[in-house]
């Protein structure tokens, strides 16, 4: 497999800067395999080991679409819903969206079961 850079994936400039800020230098194999088709609007099923960048593999294309769609989605409506099997994974995915989307001026919420409504 060729050595790609995040710049070659044609991410929105704000996302590319966020990726650089996180210290990511080159995309992982799962990111190379999934980001381009997801950015084209195609469906993808990906499978990779823990710690290989799967969250970025789907979060970056989602955030890219939000960043580049015109007009921007309404601030009063949900644009994306990510479901995870555990609270811990939900928190990790939420943190990733927050980090990657920081320069996009987006709002995100984390909701999970097993606790009262107000702590969330």
Where are the regions a protein language model picked out?
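SF2 DExD/H RNA helicase N-terminal ATP-binding lobe
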Residues: 2-120
């Amino acid at each position: 497999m060729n050595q790609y850079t995040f710049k070659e994936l044609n991410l929105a400039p704000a996302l590319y800067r966020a990726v650089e800020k996180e210290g990511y230098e080159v995309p992982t194999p799962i990111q190379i395999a999934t980001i381009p088709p997801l950015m084209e609007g195609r469906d993808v099923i990906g499978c990779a080991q823990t710690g290989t960048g799967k969250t970025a593999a789907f979060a970056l294309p989602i955030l890219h679409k939000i960043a580049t769609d015109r007009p921007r989605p309404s601030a009063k409506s949900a644009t994306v819903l990510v479901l995870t099997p555990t609270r811990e994974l939900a928190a990790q995915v939420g943190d990733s969206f927050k980090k990657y989307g920081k320069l996009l001026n987006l709002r995100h919420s984390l909701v999970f079961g097993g606790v009262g409504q107000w702590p969330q």
